[in-house]
Design a protein with these regions (language model features):
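Fe-S-dependent hydro-lyases/dehydratases of central metabolism
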Residues: 1-653
Length: 653
């Protein structure tokens, strides 16, 4: 049998391990990316490691998420990150240049390369045939040292796309349909490889929408072939030399196949409070909408915004709706201005925001109390937009524009009728507006050596956990429901995002929106354990959702299941991720129960731990679904201690 594209790339970067699905492998990393909200921890870790310069082909620091300067904290972070990038040989994409994933695939993406990003939507780059994986910041710091990436060998799922989207539909419909079928945890351990006749007609930003939101299924990543569409895209970006054709073999072997006929899709909507709560838009209960946001890394390409503008043409935003738009990059913004689409948006009453992630991660445009917001972004968790009482619905840009006009859920066809066919005439440019003046290239080693890293008062130390002891006595400090997200653990918004380089401050708000007493309670307990339901830690890659509990004394998370990136972050920061052997034990445990474990280190190594509930007088078993390397990291007290040992051993060898 032939090979999938995924397997070809993994084989070309393979360092060691067992390429059987579910087994541990180590692969070479070519590129890394970080963004401003999470990157401070990454660069603090890299500083602590002690290397003078990154050892990747290309590392980029994007200042793109929080551009709202309400006090000193965020500008402190940006100045620190820019100075650290200069010191360590890293590119900087300055504020206003664009959202990390859009800029990276446009200006740095190379088919066949492996990229690690400190953001869960890093798989965006799979649109051009890269293997792009979202991880926590400590894993990015590790990759920047040149140490191979630790990965569980994925299953590869073939997604066969046939047919053609009807006018007024968007590739957003494809990924929403995938979420409807696969669910928010069904993609765990999988790479989704998109093939089929419909793929050949799909432009790169449309593919990126699908690859980007594969993260919502819990997937390791998603990938498309590097074909004629990729060749056209890279030529339009003025980088034709970056193109290499990369295709799966015709007889490629896959672990599973999913078939989707695009002709059968209609406009879809993801209802609160999970992105897999998907139904046809016309079947959704009509709600009066107060806010519409068109933007985010998922759906703010040239074609996305141009099509939304054409839906608005001749119409105006409903008087009861606040409609905003954030374009994905300066490059796309200038192109839209040149072609008249920005004027169409302004004429319709759309408010244009700064080029940034912004509202997607609750930095501005928080909905009203009990408000209904329709967005083209990727997540609709409770509180994701900054207000836990709001209800967030996810749709395509075409449907978002129609909804803004009507004031309730609507499609482009509802507004345009037969003229909706005009939308099919919109394509990505044959030549993009190239201006890299807001990308700062790495300094030479000689110049970098002269750079002093600038630390404002908001830049605090990176906490480093101690290795686990032989005995653990710890109460339960928090019992979580199913599908707790990293937003629940560490809130988004401009206020909270600006605290993320200051763990002593940020930790005070751990679980703040759902249990305001948690931080004080956990700190008073000294050491404690968190109990979780299914899919604990889904969503964003923010490692603060592991660091903050660790700083407050949390030693372990015991859950029914744990999301991939969050499990890795727990391991990296010395919190032991444990899974119930019998899910019924979850119901027997209560907050503040006192737990006891003997011979903890020995049991960790055996991957099976017996825990006694001293309060209720019973024992139960948990398992550790960790690789050999992850067990080593846990026993060492986290990745930073492990990496330092490894690099010191290399020096002595």
């Amino acid at each position: 049998m032939g090979k999938s594209l995924t397997r070809k790339i993994i084989e070309s970067h393979f360092v060691s391990g067992d390429m059987t699905p579910g087994k541990e492998i180590f692969i070479k990393v070519d590129q890394t990316l970080t963004h401003d909200i999470n990157a401070v921890m990454t660069y603090l870790a890299f500083e602590a490691i002690g290397l003078d310069r990154v050892r990747t082909e290309c590392s980029v620091s994007y200042l793109d998420h929080n551009l709202l300067y309400v006090d000193n904290k965020t500008p402190d972070d940006h100045i620190y990150l820019q100075s650290a990038a200069k010191k360590f040989g890293v590119y900087v994409s300055r504020p206003g240049n664009g959202i990390c994933h859009t800029v990276h695939v446009s200006r740095f993406g190379v088919p066949g390369k492996v990229s690690m990003g400190g953001d869960s939507h890093t798989p965006h780059g799979g649109a051009i045939g890269m293997l792009c994986i979202g991880v926590g910041g400590m894993d990015v710091a590790t990759a920047m040292t040149g140490v191979p990436m630790r990965l569980t060998m994925p299953r590869v799922v073939r997604v066969n796309l046939t047919g053609k989207l009807r006018p007024g539909c968007n590739s957003k419909e494809v990924i929403l349909e995938m979420l409807r079928r696969v669910t928010i945890k069904g993609g765990l351990g999988n790479v989704y490889e998109y093939v089929g006749p419909a793929v050949a007609e799909m432009e790169i930003p449309a593919r990126a929408t699908i690859a980007n939101m594969g993260a919502e299924m819990g997937a390791t990543t998603s990938i498309f072939p590097a074909d004629a569409q990729v060749k056209r895209f890279l030529a339009a970006q003025g980088r034709p030399e970056a193109y290499t054709e990369l295709l799966p073999d015709e007889d490629a072997e896959y672990d599973e196949t999913i078939d989707i006929n695009l002709s059968e899709l209609e406009p879809l909507i993801a209802c609160p409070h999970q992105p897999d709560n998907v139904m046809p838009l016309h079947q959704a209960e009509k709600k009066r909408v107060q806010q519409v946001f068109i933007g985010s890394c998922t759906n703010a390409s040239y074609a996305d915004i141009a099509k939304a503008a054409l839906v608005f043409k001749g119409h105006h935003v409903n008087e009861d709706v606040s409609c905003t738009c954030a374009v994905s990059s300066k490059q796309v913004y200038r192109q839209l201005m040149r072609d008249g689409y920005v004027e169409m948006l302004l004429d319709a009453g759309v408010r244009l925001l700064e080029i940034a992630c912004g509202p997607c991660c609750a930095i501005g445009q928080t909905p009203a109390t009990d408000g209904v917001a329709v967005r083209t972004s990727n997540r609709n968790f409770k509180g994701r937009a900054g207000n836990p009482t709001a209800k967030i619905y996810l749709v395509s840009p075409e449907s978002a524009a129609a909804t803004a006009i009507v004031g309730t859920f609507a499609t482009a066809e509802d507004i345009m009728g037969e003229n909706v066919k005009i939308l099919d005439s919109i394509h990505e440019p044959d030549q993009y507006d190239i201006d890299d003046s807001m990308i700062l290239p790495p300094l030479s080693p000689e110049e970098a050596a002269k750079v002093e890293i600038v630390r404002g008062p908001n830049i605090k130390f990176l906490p480093v956990p101690e290795p686990p002891q032989e005995t653990l006595d710890a109460p339960i400090s928090f019992k979580a429901r199913d599908n707790v997200s990293t937003d629940d653990i560490t809130p988004a918004s401009a206020e909270f995002s600006s605290m993320r380089s200051n763990i002593p401050l940020m930790s005070q708000y751990c679980y703040h929106r759902y249990d305001p007493e948690f931080a004080a309670r956990a700190k008073e307990m000294g050491q404690s354990v968190i109990i979780g339901g299914e899919n604990y830690g889904q969503g964003s890659s923010r490692e603060h959702a592991a660091i903050n509990p660790m700083y407050l004394g949390v030693k372990a998370v015991i859950a029914k299941s744990i999301a991939r990136i969050h499990k890795g972050n727990l391991v990296n920061h010395g919190v032991i991720p444990m899974l119930f052997e019998d899910g019924a034990d979850y119901d027997r445990l209560e907050q503040t129960d006192e737990l006891h474990i003997d011979n903890l280190r020995e049991q960790i190594a055996a991957r099976r731990v017996q825990i006694t509930d001293k309060t209720k007088g019973f024992s139960f078993w948990v398992k550790l679904e960790l690789t050999d390397k992850e067990i080593e990291v846990v026993l060492n007290g986290g990745q930073l201690r492990t990496l330092k040992k490894q690099l010191e051993a290399e020096k002595e060898a």
